[in-house]
Amino acid sequence: SREDPDVIMLGELRDSDTIRQALTAAETGHLVLATLHTRGAVQAVDRLVDVFPADEKALIRTQLAGSLKAVIAQQLVSATDETRVGLFEVLIATSAVVNLIREGKMHQIPAILQTGAQAGMQTFEQSRLARQAEGVIH
């Protein structure tokens, strides 16, 4: 029902209050889906933390590490048939990713993303190469 949702869909996470509400909802067992305008999955994680002042960043990283399941970023590119198709970057919150978020070592996440195919991860470049191999894009 509207009063007791299992899934909460938020628009863009623009400010600290909205991000805080999303994290609280996730911590209380809700599946929270939200949008954020960034260049990729790792940048989305950075942005969520960077919105907060320095004295709150550690707490936010801990909350995020405790509730994040995945970040999916998308780009639309021109297809061979003159339509547009999506390229996707997928960051799964594995124990390694969660630990790096908690420790504030975001700069190390791209290496895990690059090599995380077995966990279901994919970079934009890997997505692009797959679409090229399919002949969907040039």
At which residue positions do the language-model features occur?
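Short, flexible helix-loop junctions that flank or precede catalytic/ligand sites
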Residues: S1-H138
